């Protein structure tokens, strides 16, 4: 499709494999000894190693701008129908499954502005004041399209179930529940 041969592709390495060394002139300029350079890993895989997600069947949920469910596996597990991704982990002989929601904590900033609140802590406080007797409001956090489980860059965010009984507090709660 792109007229590139395998010879034109870079070498592949395990994340922990040494691929070179810091250039001597850079090491000298920085006052360092020779430093090995390793292949490394993607942001989620490196973060997973940092919190100890290194063995098969371990999993974590990471909420930042996006939301990531990360599960360690011993091999490649393809789930294309669900848009669950399978990647090499940053560690040798490990893989991981990853589901990504493109808008997670970023929705909290957006909702705080939408409801006229000053910041995310104020949004959380408002959510805690939501009327428990009110009918539920549902929020789909597709403010940047979506990747998992529906790989659709055109997906849009939605509030539904709104009535006259709902206000900023109920919207705040819906956003927190929709992201979580």
Question: What is the predicted role of each segment?
Answer:
Residues 12:
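Conserved phosphate-donor
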